[in-house]
Swiss-Prot record:
This is Membrane-bound lytic murein transglycosylase C. It is found in: Cell outer membrane. SUPFAM superfamilies: Lysozyme-like (SSF53955). One of its GO terms (biological process) is cell wall organization. Its EC number is 4.2.2.n1. NCBIfam families: PRK11671.1. Its main location: membrane. It comes from Salmonella typhimurium (strain LT2 / SGSC1412 / ATCC 700720). A lipid is attached at C17 (S-diacylglycerol cysteine). It catalyses: Exolytic cleavage of the (1->4)-beta-glycosidic linkage between N-acetylmuramic acid (MurNAc) and N-acetylglucosamine (GlcNAc) residues in peptidoglycan, from either the reducing or the non-reducing ends of the peptidoglycan chains, with concomitant formation of a 1,6-anhydrobond in the MurNAc residue. Belongs to the transglycosylase Slt family. GO terms for molecular function: hydrolase activity, acting on glycosyl bonds; peptidoglycan lytic transglycosylase activity. Keywords: Cell outer membrane, Cell wall biogenesis/degradation, Lipoprotein, Lyase, Membrane, Palmitate, Signal. The gene is mltC. Murein-degrading enzyme. May play a role in recycling of muropeptides during cell elongation and/or cell division.
Length: 360
């Protein structure tokens, strides 16, 4: 669950792909303007939620959390892709079960097009799809997957009769229903993107297992993934850093649009292209492929410059130092001495996930 407790100003000179830091060695005025605008938007959005739900109940979408508000911010649907749960809640003072029923049905039947849903407003723009995103990830009370509105409605009525809960936030009563995803929900989501991953792998020469491991760690295969740093989509690509770098390398001007990065195929292509750039350009001076892979993984989160500076402020000397070490020593140093705790954990998580995909 992502509770917005504070909105930090993001430093424009840091470099990364998916975390709160950004790639790019030079000051990017356009990026700063966009980031400041995004911070203002998030602040207003969080304030609207806090006024109704209370400070401790502020819940906002994140990389592994789909959160959508409707009914003038009185109702919300939250899919926690890490925990494998769907929680639908309302603070509506009149007919709360009717609000829950409608939200449950729409959540179960929503499609997988992130461009059609604004997660930072209360507009009810969720469209019922003939191919629901959650199809196969949720089973109803009879053990059946849910594709059609009739089955979703029947299941919603069952949930309201058997699983309705309530609590007080000190201001209002919150009514909620929680639904568990199937145990292998992660694999079911991953399976949707295997073809796209395979295509990007062949195009850029990046191991499929690494792409999948990055996707799992970044978003848990949530195509709606967003972040406080405005990283977008399955591989959490930032428009004005990794996105811009990839576009420049491909001879394109400008930066990829939000809609472009919310398209799964485009997101996977861009994220994989950036992995290839890290491997073949920014960190190409590292000779051992395993050591270089550790550096690439860490750099995807915290930037290539920060990886090299762990060893030396001089990039060439840093590469030479790494080349004199065993891969195990490189891994040990990156997971214990990198200045960012997030990046230290990131290498461990991605490396572990990649091993699991290699065994399949």
């Amino acid at each position: 669950m992502k509770k917005l407790l504070a909105l930090a100003v993001i430093a424009p000179l840091l470099i990364s792909c998916s975390s709160s830091t950004k790639k790019g060695e030079t000051y990017n005025e356009a990026w700063v303007k966009d980031t400041n605008g995004f911070d203002i938007l998030m602040g207003q959005f969080a304030n609207n939620i806090e006024n109704l739900w209370g400070y401790k109940e502020v819940l906002i979408a994140g990389p592994k959390d789909y959160v959508k508000y409707t009914d003038q911010f009185q109702t919300r649907s939250h899919i926690n892709f890490d925990d494998g749960t769907i929680t639908v809640e309302t603070i509506a003072g009149t007919e709360p079960t009717a609000h829950l029923r409608r939200a449950i049905i729409k959540t179960l039947l929503m499609g997988d097009d992130p461009t059609s849903v604004d997660l930072y407003s209360d507009v009810d723009d969720i469209k019922i799809s003939k191919e629901p995103f959650l199809y196969g990830q949720v089973l109803d009370n009879t053990g059946q997957p849910i594709r059609w509105e009739g089955r979703a409605t029947t299941f919603a009525d069952y949930l309201l009769k058997t699983r309705l809960k309530s609590r007080s936030n000190g201001l209002r009563i919150i009514y909620s229903v929680t639904i568990n995803l199937v145990p292998n929900h992660l694999d079911k989501r991953a399976h949707k993107y295997i073809g796209m991953v395979r295509q990007a792998s062949r195009k850029y020469g990046v191991d499929e297992s690494l792409i999948l491991a990055i996707m799992q760690t970044e978003s848990s295969f949530n195509p709606y993934a967003v972040s406080h740093a405005d990283a977008l989509g399955l591989m959490q690509v930032v428009q004005h850093s990794a996105g811009k770098d990839v576009f420049r390398s491909q001879g394109k001007s400008g930066t990829p649009s939000r809609n472009f990065l919310f398209d799964p195929a485009s997101n996977i292509d861009t994220g994989t292209a950036y992995l290839a750039m890290l491997n073949n350009v920014y960190l190409s001076g590292i000779e051992n492929p395993t050591s270089r892979r550790y550096a690439v993984i860490t750099a995807y989160n915290g930037g290539a410059g920060s990886v090299l500076r762990v060893f030396s402020n001089d990039k060439i000397q840093a590469a030479n130092m790494i080349n004199r070490m065993s891969p195990g020593d490189v891994y040990q140093i990156l997971t214990t001495r990198h200045p960012s705790a997030e990046s230290r954990r990131y290498l461990y998580k991605v490396n572990s996930a990649q091993r699991s995909y290699r065994r399949r």
